[in-house]
């Protein structure tokens, strides 16, 4: 008798995706982040659902409803800390996942990559609207500054910004709709993640060497289920350490003050995971130029497959490209640091140089390195 998991219409899908899936035998821990992102999403949806049961999306009560959750709801403090720090873990895994894709040439699976970039944008949108909900000072002013960027769009900008706000400024209507967006978007992310996996399973996983692994595949279960389980344990350990020992480490002290439209905080800045893009936005002294640079800093990921010039897929055997990749990583860390600093010298010039280097590396230096490595590998006799 054939095993039920191979015949049942529903179990068959799960079987082909997580049990009898042929996987390359040499994929490293860098391939763990996809499943870790799935776990992060589930944690965020569950903690978010329970928080939504007690939260009120009204300007008068939003801030105190969050305080009420932390003080009066059973384990409400834990739910809130897990949800807030879960977002940080989510982005940590996202950045490592994207970095892995760039390093090992996974972006050559174009459909999977493009859906992944759409997923990244959707998660960023979700995190942004979610940060507004506690209605603290940084929530309010962050929402004001970022939504106000829409007004830089020629002709329709102001109308568009007021349409998003539901009035002439960030107010009750804005908070209510942001809560609605924040509730619906994770389910859209879940659907997109399924499509992401669907496209991935059309081709199978890439591997560190970048060489076609068809000749050496192993079943996903038990080999990679146990490996993923180890990843889950480490992720949960890190999340619990963060949420239980220093829950406010990555937050902004200004958000402990209720939103006040009459009092602007001295330094408006987003959460740490947006600082690199915020630094690029601020490095251009023109409003529209800054908005375009901000968009380009993320959308540039879509053209990375077109900029692949090397004969080899992975960077594993390409030392020049490797060096440029790690310079890019250091550059992004520099941008993250600059995004959190006040707008004054020397931070302005460092931010401008780092922003310029970011685009130069991706658009010019890395494709040139690929061509040079091709030339170096050609037999000279």
UniProtKB/Swiss-Prot annotation:
Gene3D superfamilies tied to this protein: Cytochrome Bc1 Complex, Chain C (1.20.810.10)
Q: In which organism is this protein found?
A: Dasyurus albopunctatus (Native cat)
What transmembrane ranges does the database entry give? Answer: 33-53, 77-98, 113-133, 178-198, 226-246, 288-308, 320-340, 347-367
Q: Which family does it belong to?
A: Belongs to the cytochrome b family.
Q: How does it sit in the membrane?
A: Multi-pass membrane protein
Q: What else is known?
A: Heme 1 (or BL or b562) is low-potential and absorbs at about 562 nm, and heme 2 (or BH or b566) is high-potential and absorbs at about 566 nm.
The lineage's top-level taxon is Eukaryota
- Cellular location(s): Mitochondrion inner membrane
**Which residues does a ubiquinone bind?**
201
Q: Which residues bind heme b b566?
A: 97, 196
- Tell me, what does this protein do in biology? Component of the ubiquinol-cytochrome c reductase complex (complex III or cytochrome b-c1 complex) that is part of the mitochondrial respiratory chain. The b-c1 complex mediates electron transfer from ubiquinol to cytochrome c. Contributes to the generation of a proton gradient across the mitochondrial membrane that is then used for ATP synthesis.
Q: Which cofactor does it need?
A: heme b
What is the official name of this protein in its record? Cytochrome b
Disulphide bonds in the chain: none
Which Gene Ontology terms cover its molecular function? metal ion binding; ubiquinol-cytochrome-c reductase activity
Which GO CC annotations does the UniProt entry carry?
mitochondrial inner membrane; respiratory chain complex III
Q: How does it assemble?
A: The cytochrome bc1 complex contains 11 subunits: 3 respiratory subunits (MT-CYB, CYC1 and UQCRFS1), 2 core proteins (UQCRC1 and UQCRC2) and 6 low-molecular weight proteins (UQCRH/QCR6, UQCRB/QCR7, UQCRQ/QCR8, UQCR10/QCR9, UQCR11/QCR10 and a cleavage product of UQCRFS1). This cytochrome bc1 complex then forms a dimer.
Residues that hold heme b b562 according to the record: 83, 182
Ordered alphabetically, the record's keywords are: Electron transport, Heme, Iron, Membrane, Metal-binding, Mitochondrion, Mitochondrion inner membrane, Respiratory chain, Transmembrane, Transmembrane helix, Transport, Ubiquinone
> Which biological process, per GO, is one annotated for this protein?
mitochondrial electron transport, ubiquinol to cytochrome c
Q: How is the cofactor bound?
A: Binds 2 heme b groups non-covalently.
Which InterPro entries does this UniProt record tie to the protein? Cyt_b/b6_C, Cyt_b/b6_C_sf, Cyt_b/b6_N, Cytb/b6-like_sf, Cytochrome_b, Cytochrome_b_C_euk/bac, Cytochrome_b_N_euk/bac, Di-haem_cyt_TM
